[in-house]
């Protein structure tokens, strides 16, 4: 095989390796994002459940405000 053919094959191999490594990194980042979203949802759900339970004792509604969930006789907005 000529030197030019070997050079072309080497370049193709390098390009393939670089793109497959990049794809693996993107896949890993996507999986990490999915895990973070699940954690965030479970935390939000837990806070909402705690708010509802504590407000239920006071016979009020759990309302989301800028400062987080709070108990109020009636939620606005």
From Swiss-Prot:
Domain observations: The presence of a 'disulfide through disulfide knot' structurally defines this protein as a knottin.
What does UniProt note about where in the body, tissue by tissue, this protein is expressed?
Expressed by the venom duct.
Q: What is its main location?
A: secreted
Query: Where does the signal sequence lie?
Result: 1-18
- Protein's cellular compartments: Secreted
Q: Which GO terms describe its cellular component?
A: extracellular region
Q: Which organism is it from?
A: Conus arenatus
Instruction: Tell me the protein's name.
Output: Conotoxin ArMSGL-0141
- Which InterPro entries does the UniProt entry name for this protein? Conotoxin
* Sample GO molecular function, one term: toxin activity
Q: Which domain of life is it from?
A: Eukaryota
What UniProt keywords are attached to this protein's entry?
A: Amidation, Cleavage on pair of basic residues, Disulfide bond, Knottin, Neurotoxin, Secreted, Signal, Toxin
Q: List the disulfide bonds.
A: 51-63, 55-71, 62-75
A Pfam family the protein falls into: Conotoxin
Q: Which residues carry this modification: Phenylalanine amide?
A: 76
* Propeptide residue range(s): 19-44
């Amino acid at each position: 095989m000529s030197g030019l053919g070997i050079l072309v094959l080497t370049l193709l191999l390098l390009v393939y390796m670089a793109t497959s490594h990049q794809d693996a990194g993107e896949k890993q980042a996507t999986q990490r994002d999915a895990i973070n979203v699940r954690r965030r949802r479970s935390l939000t759900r837990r806070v909402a459940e705690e708010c509802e339970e504590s407000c239920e004792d006071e016979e009020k509604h759990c309302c989301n405000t800028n400062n987080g969930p709070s108990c109020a006789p009636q939620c606005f907005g």
